Amino acid sequence: GHGIGSFLSVHEGPQKIAKNQGLSEGNIKEGMILSNEPGFYKEGEYGIRIENLIIVKRKSQTLLNFEVISWAPIDVDLIEFSLLTYDEIKWINWYHQEVFNKLSDKLNNKEKTWLFKVTQPIS
């Protein structure tokens, strides 16, 4: 993940979390916002990335954790269900329930109907 910008660049630092790309230029600190964007890429064919924004929160005196601050449904039409584990299906269903719970009261009826449809549990 990377820091989020509003005027300079969408990839603003100094914070970042990246495999094989070195350490962050600065410490991760409470209140920082980063992207969380796991993905899969098949070389020369296709790729998919699911991205959310997370904020760094203090969990204890010595431990920080992340809290999702951008909630959007995942397009399940892009998922090959036979490749998912039980825990992955369970997580998608939990995530979609959270999306609906956090957003539905801010939507009009048409929008809420759409959100309800796209956040239905998968199996």
Where in the sequence are the language-model features?
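Core alpha/beta catalytic barrel or barrel-like domain that forms the active/cofactor pocket
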Residues: 1-7
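Charged, cofactor-coupling segments
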Residues: 7-123
